Amino acid sequence: MKTICLYFQVHQPMRLKRYRFFNIGNDHYYYDDYLNESIMHKVANKCYLPANKLLLQLIKEYGTNFKVTFSISGIAMDQFRLYAPEVLDSFKKLAETGCVEFLAETYSHSLVAFKNDEEFRKQVELHTDRIKEFLNVEPKVFRGTELIYSDEIGAKVFDMGFPIVVTEGAKHIMGWKSSNFLYCNAINPKQKVLLRNYELSDDLAFRFSNQSWAEYPLTAEKYVGWISEALENGETANLFLDYETFGEHQSKESGIFDFLKHFPKEVLKKTSFKFATPSEIAEKLQPVSAVSVPHPISWADEERDLTAWLGNDLQEDAFNKLYSLTERIQKCEDKKILIDWKYLQSSDHFYYMSTKVFSDGEVHSYFNPFDSPYDAYINYMNILSDFIIRLNSAVPENQKDQELATLAAIIFDKNKQIEKYEAEILKLKKGPLKTTSSKATKKTVTTKPPSKTVAKKAPAKAKTSKTVQPKTATKKKTTAKKAAATKKAKTK
């Protein structure tokens, strides 16, 4: 039996807001809510909702003959709950059909597998729990962030209970081998490995609407013909895509939804191929050999390695600084700090710091909120500096940090008390002041004439009496003399 495996990745990071140096220590909220919500609504309306609706219609039409596979990051599910719960509901409807498989990955869509095994396990377990909670299914297959994989990572996830992984069929690891077969892990042969056919996958993901492409336009009929050629000497065609291919990276006007609508019909009508999930393929096929991947691979960029996230000094510095906090994070019980820890681990933050150019640079610009890799680095490190201050308070690193944390707690409590007392003082001032002012006004109106006039005029009256008395005596003497002179004149 020859199969086609359609797998779609769904992920949106919590994008960070512009965080300045002067915000450090003062602002502990790091996310651009407006940008995150607007992008989620945009992608939901252009991709997730119409694509899910179409897939549900196809499953109803073709039943178990049409099957697809998804991986949805934990951070994406968080944002669905916040901004677009209808998207989560549409995925639930797909899960209920029994024709859709959901894969496990790290909750944060992170690169933690390269730093700490315990944290890696916790994130995978948390993601698995979320899938069970929201979609009522239990993942049996693992996919690394951006299909990152190595022999060592494969062996680790096998021990976690995942006997099947999916990854990239990179040229430098395949050599003469074909990605159209099932393989096994080089360290643990019990683990089965499905490899992405990157040529057929990229025809849809990147070249579908490219009018300068020699094969443009790509029809469902032509594409099925290419799959038939690939499976002449193969057993499975693994078509792994970013789900935003439908409606976002390739617009509705490009005809991508019409392509998806007619694709199952062309396959089922003109070939004997079966659509299958990774679990079904691993159950029905046997590995042809081991695939050796001593160094990590991914599906990103031309190199198919980790350079998209860890390819320059900026990325390495930020990455190492973040994971140097792991041991203390594991001792932390502050819920807000732990939530930020999950969101700050998203691989996208390091992806935005990439200095790659040309064709890969165009891909790196998708939903990138920063003007340059250096802006992304500075912004992230400012946030990380504030995060470390908070972590030092919650989980001191040494005796000095312990003392500082204690003092910081005391200062915090004192500031709270001061704010309380200042509020009480202000309240007291506002109350009595109004009453006093009213009484004073009333008193002034009724008592001003008698009290203030008498008090101020009394000295003046005393002074006036002293000066008037001599004048009165002189006037009397003058009058007496005139009277005597008049009498004397009459006598004569």
Language model feature labels by segment:
Residues N52-L56, L88-K92, R121-I131, G154, ...:
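Generic structural signal for well-ordered alpha-helices
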Residues K430-K492:
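Intrinsically disordered, polybasic Lys/Arg-rich low-complexity tracts
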Residues E119-E146, W226-F240:
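CE4/NodB-like, metal-dependent polysaccharide N-deacetylase domain
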Residues T3-F8, M14-N116, K140-R143, P163-E168, ...:
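Short, well-structured secondary-structure segments
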Residues M1-K46, K60, F181-Y183, I187-Q191, ...:
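Active-site and substrate-binding clefts of carbohydrate-active enzymes
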Residues V87-A104, R121, E125, V137, ...:
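Acidic, His- and aromatic-enriched active-site or binding-groove loops in soluble protein domains
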